[in-house]
UniProtKB/Swiss-Prot annotation:
Binds a dinuclear copper A center per subunit. This is Cytochrome c oxidase subunit 2. Component of the cytochrome c oxidase, the last enzyme in the mitochondrial electron transport chain which drives oxidative phosphorylation. The respiratory chain contains 3 multisubunit complexes succinate dehydrogenase (complex II, CII), ubiquinol-cytochrome c oxidoreductase (cytochrome b-c1 complex, complex III, CIII) and cytochrome c oxidase (complex IV, CIV), that cooperate to transfer electrons derived from NADH and succinate to molecular oxygen, creating an electrochemical gradient over the inner membrane that drives transmembrane transport and the ATP synthase. Disulfide bonds: none annotated. InterPro entries: CcO_II (IPR045187), CcO_II-like_C (IPR002429), CcO_II_C (IPR034210), Copper_CuA (IPR001505), Cupredoxin (IPR008972), Cyt_c_oxidase_su2 (IPR014222), Cyt_c_oxidase_su2_TM_dom (IPR011759), Cyt_c_oxidase_su2_TM_sf (IPR036257). GO terms for molecular function: copper ion binding; cytochrome-c oxidase activity. Cu cation A1 binds at H161, C196, C200, M207. Its cofactor is Cu cation. Component of the cytochrome c oxidase (complex IV, CIV), a multisubunit enzyme composed of 14 subunits. The complex is composed of a catalytic core of 3 subunits MT-CO1, MT-CO2 and MT-CO3, encoded in the mitochondrial DNA, and 11 supernumerary subunits COX4I, COX5A, COX5B, COX6A, COX6B, COX6C, COX7A, COX7B, COX7C, COX8 and NDUFA4, which are encoded in the nuclear genome.
Amino acid sequence: MAYPFQLGFQDATSPIMEELLHFHDHTLMIVFLISSLVLYIISSMLTTKLTHTSTMDAQEVETIWTILPAIILILIALPSLRILYMMDEINNPSLTVKTMGHQWYWSYEYTDYEDLTFDSYMIPTSDLKPGELRLLEVDNRVVLPMEMTIRMLISSEDVLHSWAVPSLGLKTDAIPGRLNQTTLVASRPGLYYGQCSEICGSNHSFMPIVLELVPLKHFEEWSASML
């Protein structure tokens, strides 16, 4: 999860988030090299009074600065498209969970079970126990099995919301009348926090998301206790 004065991303908990972090580093390096080159050219132009007449009007230079940006864009686009298709691919999910956004709480339905549904509200600051996180704790956590493909179906009952868990690389809009889906695969157990990421009214900041990823055996015990 995030911590005070954090400058980087949260630690990746899913294969998709790991790919996104690698893509970020790849793109950042390209941007850094381009920025360094531009800064060098500007500095050299400002610090010298000489004019390079051979480069002011040259067919070779125009060819280079047309082809080189195209190559750079391809180097950025190819890994981006690969990750995009990975995020949209859902093959034989082990579990499906339907998430509905409300003003201002989330409701969850485990569609593979007969009657496993609950609402998830933020715990007020006055009711927090020692060690619990302000504005991030909920009364009912979403318990899910780790290392299994889980399909999340996301929609809304009223206005636009967005279901986001940064450490898993998830951010999917909850749109009234539309059912969006995303894939969730957690590589290790733990508590993972998120929040509504679409301004949805006066209590938008009070719609936290808490996922509790556990081994399959513990998930089966939890689901049996909830039925």
